[in-house]
UniProtKB/Swiss-Prot annotation:
Function: Removes the formyl group from the N-terminal Met of newly synthesized proteins. Requires at least a dipeptide for an efficient rate of reaction. N-terminal L-methionine is a prerequisite for activity but the enzyme has broad specificity at other positions.
UniProt cofactor note: Binds 1 Fe(2+) ion.
Gene designation per UniProt: def
Active site positions: E155
Xref: PANTHER family: PEPTIDE DEFORMYLASE, PEPTIDE DEFORMYLASE 2
The protein, known as: Peptide deformylase
Native species: Lactobacillus delbrueckii subsp. bulgaricus (strain ATCC 11842 / DSM 20081 / BCRC 10696 / JCM 1002 / NBRC 13953 / NCIMB 11778 / NCTC 12712 / WDCM 00102 / Lb 14)
């Protein structure tokens, strides 16, 4: 089981490297990694389990965040009522198209690998099309909007060596375009 002590923190070089693409069929090691990352997200969203193991809640976890420099990320995205609206493990994901219109979270973003609060809006495309493979090697392309699009962008950024605060406007952290959709 992945615990907070296993999460790589900001400053570790693996978080700033472009993750290596995986080949299929996935080895048992990478299949287990996918299961373990999803298990962390499920456990972290269960208040009793999270408290018992001192887990910070997460909606996404990329392989580099657990020290594995490979292109894989687990996502478990709830709606504002806590119901799961998107659950997937991406292998070798790419955002192949995105909307011009941006969206962001009203409270900004956080990250399991970043221990401090970094204030500011993190504008991301409101709609994205993600091309990826499943753990079983099935090729997929999906369109996402709103919160699932934000989480997908955050995790895919990890796979490209970027952290959420790289997207915050340095001069005015709370500046937004007029038509940016602010959610939650």
């Amino acid at each position: 089981m992945i615990l907070m002590k296993d999460i790589v923190r900001d400053g570790d070089p693996v978080l700033r490297q472009v993750a290596q693409k995986l080949t299929f069929p996935l080895s048992d090691h990478y299949r287990k990694l996918a299961d373990d990352m999803m298990e962390y997200l499920v456990n972290s969203q269960d208040p009793k389990i999270a408290a018992k193991h001192q887990l910070r809640a997460g909606v996404g976890l990329a392989a580099p965040q657990v020290g594995e420099g490979v292109s894989m990320a687990a996502l478990l995205v709830p709606d504002d009522k806590g119901e799961i609206i998107f659950k997937e493990v991406y292998v070798n994901p790419e955002i192949i198209s995105e909307s011009v219109r941006k969206t962001c979270l009203s409270e900004g973003e956080g990250c399991l690998s970043v221990d401090k609060v970094i204030d500011g809006y993190v504008p991301r495309p409101n709609k994205v099309t993600v091309h990826y493979w499943t753990v079983d090697g099935e090729e997929k392309t999906i369109r996402l909007k709103g919160y699932p699009a934000i989480v997908s962008g955050h995790e895919i950024d990890h796979l490209n060596g970027h952290l959420f605060y790289d997207r915050i406007n340095k001069e005015n952290p709370f500046a937004l375009d007029e038509d940016t959709i602010v959610i939650y």
